Amino acid sequence: TPDWAADTLPCIPSAYSGASPVLKLTRGKDGKTTPAELWFHRRLRVHHGNAVRIGDHVYGSSGDFGPSFVAAADVKTGQILWQDRSFSKANFILADGRLIILDEDGNLALATAGPSGLKVISKAAVLEKTAWTAPTLVGTKLFIRDRRSIMALDLG
């Protein structure tokens, strides 16, 4: 899922033999939009579908087939700001300025992220392994699932 912002710099999360490029979109006088790759970094291979953009930084779970980690990159330069190995491959959603993280091992966490690092507020094992689906937040209800079950948690 691409991450968009008003500065026309979408991040396109991908893995395997690729990486997660950031594109620069330019509108010509003819009204046509032209994409150009701004940067491409092999250390940001977002394996599970999504990344989150907060300001000028993009946060994603990299790992492809190797060791996994949460990483932060400067969206304008591609510089990797930090890596955190406390999660297996994970999906994220942004809620009220905080990240809700669900990793593939079933660990659910609430965290804050910034250019200097990831701060985990709380973390708990709530599902079995193979939790690949991104969490969904509807109001105060958080829906999460692994390959065998689905769970609704009231965060209100």
Over which residues does each language-model region extend?
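Noncatalytic, solvent-exposed loop/strand surfaces
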Residues: 1-156
